[in-house]
């Protein structure tokens, strides 16, 4: 498998030589730690070599340099992932020396390729320009609040997995190709809010647009460009092999094509892999047998090897980094919308059989990734 992946990478070297991406673009290895505050409130503790540790400091000490955090508009079903909770997460990340990425969901709940529900507070707004202003003002006010706390993020995601049209009514949700006249107006409003605030304060913030799975990004960014959505800095991708048409060795093809076409660096802003198929609580796990790839068993070593392989491929293709989704979402007594416990403890970086002791997956942060892998 190693030779196969390296050979595929070598073929791409000529193609990625002229991506238009600056040579000084940083390469991030990070984690989405949005769940940590809630997990600790629910009684979770985290350990490294048997000793209790602060999870943010642990990730920083292990080499993580970027923390991603989601923000919901007004989630009445939980007290987490609101501005107060997000501010706490950003502060903990910055105090540990890591940079931050703020992920605006523009919803009161989860957004993803299947749903992009408008916040209840905006549901009455039918005029696109008026809705765009509400989005602009909310984005600006959020950044201003964080800035006052000296918590302004380094990167901002304008939407989360926006494969379908954003800010849709739940009872009239439309999948498939977005209404680009409306969608472009709304997305550009969010982008403009970030740009204007950055310009006003003189504080740089990179804009990320985020699509789930590389095969969707190829058509989405083409249509976005055709409809005037062009002012962004980073192409963000979710990459989960279970749900992608692209196998791991094929991923650099998509990264190279996106970077060659749009001259923007590509970052994997979500990925994950199970270290076991065992379920430790009543909440069903999202990543089960179908998530397991032949080359990477569902084991601590398999999880690490997947991450090392993925990150090397992204680096070799000229990508900007890899962020692991919710490696600290461990099992607790608390409930989600769907069950009691965690739906992700078998894909976390902590061993549920050893009181949440750190797993080998942490080694992926400090691995020596080469900018250009050579075929063997």
Curated annotation (Swiss-Prot):
UniProt keyword annotation of Signal present: yes
Cofactor requirements of the protein: Ca(2+)
SUPFAM superfamilies: (Trans)glycosidases (SSF51445)
EC number: 3.2.1.89
Effect of residue 161 to A: Partial loss of activity
Cofactor annotation remark: Binds 1 Ca(2+) ion per subunit.
Broad enzyme group: hydrolase
Notes on temperature effects: Optimum temperature is 60 degrees Celsius.
pH behavior: Optimum pH is 7.5.
Pfam families in the cross-refs: Glyco_hydro_53 (PF07745)
Binding residue positions for Ca(2+): 281, 285
Stated family: Belongs to the glycosyl hydrolase 53 family.
Listed name of the protein: Arabinogalactan endo-beta-1,4-galactanase
């Amino acid at each position: 498998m190693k030779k196969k992946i390296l050979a595929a990478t070598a073929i791409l070297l000529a193609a990625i030589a002229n991506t238009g991406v600056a040579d000084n673009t940083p390469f991030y290895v990070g984690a989405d730690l949005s769940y940590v505050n809630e997990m600790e409130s629910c009684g979770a503790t985290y350990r490294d070599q048997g000793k209790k540790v602060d999870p943010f400091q642990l990730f920083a000490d292990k080499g993580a340099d970027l923390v991603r955090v989601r923000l919901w508009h007004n989630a009445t079903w939980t007290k987490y992932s609101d501005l107060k909770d997000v501010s706490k997460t950003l502060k903990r990340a910055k105090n540990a020396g890591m940079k931050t990425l703020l992920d605006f969901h523009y919803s009161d709940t989860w957004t993803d390729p299947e749903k992009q529900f408008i916040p209840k507070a905006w549901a009455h707004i039918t005029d696109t320009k008026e809705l765009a202003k509400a989005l602009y003002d909310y984005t600006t006010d959020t950044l201003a609040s964080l800035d006052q706390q000296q918590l302004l993020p380094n990167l901002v995601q304008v939407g989360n997995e926006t494969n379908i049209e954003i800010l849709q009514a739940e009872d009239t949700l439309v999948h498939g190709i977005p209404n680009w006249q409306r969608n472009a107006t709304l997305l550009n409003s969010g982008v403009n809010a970030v740009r204007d605030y950055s310009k006003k304060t003189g504080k740089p913030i990179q804009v990320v647009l985020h699509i789930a799975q590389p095969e969707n990004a190829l058509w989405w960014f083409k249509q976005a460009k055709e409809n005037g959505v062009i002012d962004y800095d980073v192409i963000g991708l979710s990459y989960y092999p279970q749900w992608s048409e692209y196998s791991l060795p094929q991923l650099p093809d998509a990264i190279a094509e996106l970077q060659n076409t749009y001259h923007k660096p590509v970052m994997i802003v979500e990925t994950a892999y199970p270290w076991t198929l065992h379920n430790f609580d009543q909440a069903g796990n999202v990543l089960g047998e179908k998530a397991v790839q032949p080359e990477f068993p569902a084991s601590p070593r398999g999880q690490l090897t997947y991450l090392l392989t993925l990150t090397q491929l992204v680096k070799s293709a000229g990508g900007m980094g890899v962020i692991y989704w919710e490696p600290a979402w461990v099992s607790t007594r608390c409930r989600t919308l769907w069950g009691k416990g965690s739906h992700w403890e078998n894909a976390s970086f902590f061993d549920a059989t050893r009181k949440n002791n750190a797993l080998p997956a942490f080694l992926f942060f400090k691995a020596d990734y080469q900018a250009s892998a050579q075929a063997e």
